[in-house]
Amino acid sequence: MANSSSGVAIHDDCKLKFNELQSKRMHRFITFMMDNKGKEIIVDKIGDRTTSYEDFTSSLPEGDCRFAIYDFDFLTAEDVPKSRIFYILWSPDNAKVRSKMLYASSNERFKKELNGIQLEVQATDAGEISLDALKDRVK
């Protein structure tokens, strides 16, 4: 399906893999990227349930943008286990301007395709998506 503001299509696997993460809890994270022609959003990487948060953050490229979903498990102040699905727009400062613009213009439309996102983060550096930063968001 094409994105009206950027003309970018969203591959069917994106929604399928998101639903596997959300409903079946098959994955810990999914990263999504533009294909080489900048015409379609595709699945980039998938981390299984045993994948660490460090593995997730190291999967994000230092010099390019990505969309990402992370299923964050945590304990409440009352020691109740909970989970929140984070949507992350990764747009590092040193990414190419064209890439930043393409991801920014596709962001809202892509987010709407992934029904069930609970929290959103737009990050330009690793500190903005540190484990502590996510913990602060779920308090």
Swiss-Prot record:
Segments crossing the lipid bilayer: none
Subcellular location, record wording: Cytoplasm, Cytoskeleton
InterPro entries tied to this protein: ADF-H, ADF-H/Gelsolin-like_dom_sf, ADF/Cofilin
Highest taxon listed in the record's lineage: Eukaryota
Domain called ADF-H: residue spans: 5-139
Coiled-coil ranges (or none): none
GO-annotated cellular components: actin cytoskeleton; cytoplasm
Sample GO molecular function, one term: actin filament binding
Keywords: Actin-binding, Cytoplasm, Cytoskeleton, Plant defense
Knocked-out gene: effects: Decreased germination rates due to decreased alpha-amylase activity during seed germination. Increased susceptibility to infection by the fungal blast (Magnaporthe grisea), bacterial blight (Xanthomonas oryzae pv. oryzae, Xoo) and the herbivorous insect brown planthopper (Nilaparvata lugens, BPH). Almost no induction of the defense-related genes PR1A, LOX2 and CHS1 after exposure to biotic stresses.
GO BP: actin filament depolymerization; defense response
One Pfam family hit: Cofilin_ADF
Chief location of this protein within or outside the cell: cytoplasm
The protein's assembly and partners: Interacts with LECRK1 (via kinase domain).
Function: Actin-depolymerizing protein. Severs actin filaments (F-actin) and binds to actin monomers. Involved in innate immunity. Required for the expression of defense-related genes PR1A, LOX2 and CHS1 upon biotic stresses. Required for basal resistance to the fungal blast (Magnaporthe grisea), bacterial blight (Xanthomonas oryzae pv. oryzae, Xoo) and the herbivorous insect brown planthopper (Nilaparvata lugens, BPH). Involved in the promotion of seed germination. Required for the expression of alpha-amylase genes during seed germination.
PANTHER family (UniProt xref): COFILIN-RELATED (PTHR11913)
Family to which the UniProt record says this protein belongs: Belongs to the actin-binding proteins ADF family.
Protein name: Actin-depolymerizing factor 4
Organism, as annotated: Oryza sativa subsp. japonica (Rice)
Gene name of this polypeptide: ADF4
